[in-house]
Amino acid sequence: MTSLENYIYNEITSRYADFDAAHREDHVSTVISQALELLDRMPSWLQDHPEARESWDLPVDRNVLLAAAACHDLGLVNGRDNHHLDSGKIIRADERLKEWFDTEQIETIAQAAEDHRASGKSAPRSIYGMLVAEADRVIDGETIIRRTIQFGQKHYPELDREGHIERAIAHLREKYGRGGYLKLWIPWSDNAARLAELQDIIADDTAIRNKVSVIFNSL
């Protein structure tokens, strides 16, 4: 393990332990592994899609991507509303990162964290932001529904069972439903097919209510 990896895995990811259940250490570990996997898959996709080389054949520093993925949600320490912007501030203020990165690289890491949020209206400013944003959007129906419910339980404790189910369904439709605000950025990601499957469930009123109810009862 390199000194950077030691810092990331022993000091950065541990900060997620105090966040809500949907954004704890398992979440950041998944985002890190997914971001690096997407990077590793890029060359073979470019080989199969030579017409995309002009847009996508970009140099990517693996360590910069690792740091961006690891730090993307650190701003949750101040709450969710502006966590992407707060993550950028925390990254820029981290003196330890200067041991491995220059000022430009740290700014790239900070911008990737700022740009990862699904509700953002603009595309990420760099391929690092796109990779982190895509990795943060791991499309697994059960995981998404569980995280949605868990977020509601933490932030809306006054709701009863039916209230939590209704809130979860409304959020799923707004974010993941057809025409929802979630955007995917990496064309070689598996997320598009998985999102289509989830959208089929969300579009079926009975199916989505049953799915949310079953997962709610399991928590």
Where are the model-predicted features located?
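Short alpha-helical hairpin
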Residues: 1-14, 36, 40-43
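Alpha-helix N-cap/helix-start motif at coil-to-helix transitions, marked by capping-box chemistry
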Residues: 2-6, 22-29, 59, 103, ...
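Intrinsically disordered, low-complexity activation-like regions
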Residues: 10-11, 15, 114, 141
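Divalent metal-dependent phosphate-bond-processing catalytic cores, especially two-metal-ion Mg2+/Mn2+ enzymes
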Residues: 17-25, 29-59, 71, 118-219
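An active-site-proximal "capping" alpha-helix that borders the catalytic cofactor pocket
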Residues: 31-38, 82-97
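Acidic/histidine metal-binding catalytic segments
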Residues: 44-48, 57-64, 99-113, 128
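His-Asp-centered metal-binding catalytic motifs of divalent-metal-dependent phosphohydrolases/nucleases
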Residues: 58-79, 83, 87, 108-117
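Short helix-to-loop capping/linker segments positioned immediately adjacent to catalytic or ligand/cofactor-binding
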Residues: 78, 97-101, 119-123
